[in-house]
């Protein structure tokens, strides 16, 4: 896909919900975008065709003259467009038929169906965006919380790319100084080793400052997966319902009511959280319940955090111990539910387990009590605290973290080379590695295969 030949591409740019969408957009980009649009769009009246001016009219099949839709057209001529090419958007009525037929007319008129992410790839290749900005567009589209959206917007505005380019320029300056001494050793004064050591230390510290945001950024981007586990009838489903503030799971006094995983999507302290209410774990002869129990075990093993829930009035039982042993390799937070059934004195007297937990939280889910304490304990357990009040300029992805780590490691080797007073040729190897790694974040140095992989993760039409 990389290295496009200048052809014109087309794709549906909006999500299509059959019979429900109000507006659907078909987007064209390329040298022939306006010519193709003129073939299929009939302007109503005497409206002038001008860039960035919306036109009203009709989409028609140019061969048969058949009316396809009443629509709006928005031309955005190069370079003042998303891709820095001529871009035309056709705003149709939503639903499948109008946009699909409009897209087919565009292709018949000479456009090619765009590949996933190809519009953004063209924006990158044409210098409209750097690679970190391009990746942030996918993050913005998939953001599950206001904080994740804020981080994506910060990166889109260049708040990640700018410091990365500054770091790369500093490394390039050091490399230029070193190579000048290699090529013109007799004509230049010796390197100021103390100054270079200070520059390397400062650059490494700046890289570490960016890397220190990686864990929180990953939580913003991908979220947490939390499994609520426990024996039957301890209030797991009530806990999910109270937490979700709606009836997501059926609640009865009968053990084994929940037989399958029940999922809820929540935001906790700015972090997207997928909560799974699992079937009560116990020995059972019921084949359907056995399947649910096995799914509960698998859900717990794949969770980032397990909420082991017990009944306050029953205390810690042998069954609870067995369940703990099954999930003990995961981070566990103990939830003591139904606290309202005990007096204050009884709560203090209850025998708590000796195992180490991330935290112990008392709740009364049926009365919606203890949920705030639970959320605070979760944020403490993952080590983030509440992220809603923080200003997020970016959220590093795994590729960016790996590149920064590579650059940081390479600079440390340069420092070691300096301290060991090795020949200057040794410096250049590691400096070039750091420069290449930093350049891969913003796209100055990136393999075509990596570009294809990055943009293949985008949706078609973006």
Curated annotation (Swiss-Prot):
PROSITE patterns: G_TRME. Coiled coil: none annotated. The keyword tRNA processing applies. Its cofactor is K(+). Pfam families: MMR_HSR1, MnmE_helical, TrmE_N. It is an enzyme of class 3 (hydrolase). GTP binds at residues 233-238, 252-258, 277-280. It comes from the Bacteria. (6S)-5-formyl-5,6,7,8-tetrahydrofolate binds at residues 27, 89, 128, 462. GO terms for molecular function: GTP binding; GTPase activity; metal ion binding. Its EC number is 3.6.-.-. K(+) binds at residues 233, 252, 254, 257. It is found in: Cytoplasm. Exhibits a very high intrinsic GTPase hydrolysis rate. Involved in the addition of a carboxymethylaminomethyl (cmnm) group at the wobble position (U34) of certain tRNAs, forming tRNA-cmnm(5)s(2)U34. Belongs to the TRAFAC class TrmE-Era-EngA-EngB-Septin-like GTPase superfamily. TrmE GTPase family. NCBIfam families: mnmE_trmE_thdF, small_GTP. Homodimer. Heterotetramer of two MnmE and two MnmG subunits. This is tRNA modification GTPase MnmE. The gene is mnmE.
């Amino acid at each position: 896909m990389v290295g496009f030949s200048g052809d014109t591409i087309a794709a549906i740019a909006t999500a299509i919900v059959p019979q429900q969408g109000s507006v659907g957009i078909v987007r064209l980009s390329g040298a022939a975008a306006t010519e193709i649009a003129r073939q299929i769009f009939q302007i109503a009246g005497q409206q002038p065709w001008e860039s960035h001016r919306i036109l009203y009219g009709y989409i028609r099949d140019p061969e048969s003259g058949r009316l396809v839709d009443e629509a709006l057209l928005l031309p955005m001529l190069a370079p003042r467009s998303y891709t820095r090419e001529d871009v035309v958007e056709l705003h149709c009525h939503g639903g499948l038929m109008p946009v699909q037929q409009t897209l087919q007319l565009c292709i018949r008129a000479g456009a090619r169906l765009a590949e996933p992410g190809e519009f953004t790839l063209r924006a990158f290749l044409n210098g409209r965006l750097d690679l970190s900005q391009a990746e942030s567009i996918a993050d913005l589209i998939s953001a599950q919380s206001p904080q994740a959206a804020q981080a994506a917007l910060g990166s889109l505005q260049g708040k990640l790319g700018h410091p990365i380019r500054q770091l790369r320029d500093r490394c390039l300056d050091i490399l230029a100084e070193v190579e000048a001494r290699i090529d013109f050793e007799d004509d230049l004064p010796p390197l100021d080793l103390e100054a270079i050591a200070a520059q390397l230390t400062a650059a490494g510290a700046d890289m570490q400052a960016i890397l220190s945001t990686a864990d929180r950024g990953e939580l913003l981007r991908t979220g947490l997966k939390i499994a609520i586990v426990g024996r039957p009838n301890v209030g797991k489903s009530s806990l999910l319902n109270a937490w979700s503030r709606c009836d997501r799971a059926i609640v009865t006094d009968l053990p084994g009511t929940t037989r399958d995983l029940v999922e809820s999507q929540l935001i906790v302290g700015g972090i997207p959280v997928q909560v799974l209410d699992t079937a009560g774990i116990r020995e059972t002869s019921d084949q359907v319940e056995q399947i649910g129990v096995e799914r509960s075990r698998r859900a717990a093993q794949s969770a980032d955090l397990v909420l082991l829930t017990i009944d306050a009035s029953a205390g810690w039982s042998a069954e609870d111990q067995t369940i703990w042993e099954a999930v003990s390799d995961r981070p566990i937070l103990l939830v003591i539910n139904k606290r309202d059934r005990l007096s204050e004195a009884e709560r203090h007297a209850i025998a708590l387990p000796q195992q180490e937990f991330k935290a112990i939280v008392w709740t009364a889910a049926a009365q919606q009590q203890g949920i705030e304490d639970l959320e605070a304990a979760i944020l403490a357990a993952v080590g983030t605290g509440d992220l809603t009040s923080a200003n997020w300029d970016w959220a590093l992805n795994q590729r960016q973290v790996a590149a920064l780590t590579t650059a940081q490691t390479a600079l440390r080797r340069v420092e070691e080379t300096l301290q060991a007073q090795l020949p200057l040729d040794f410096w250049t190897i590691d400096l070039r590695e750091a420069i290449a790694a930093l350049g891969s974040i913003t796209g100055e140095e990136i393999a075509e295969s990596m570009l294809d992989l990055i943009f293949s993760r985008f949706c078609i039409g973006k």
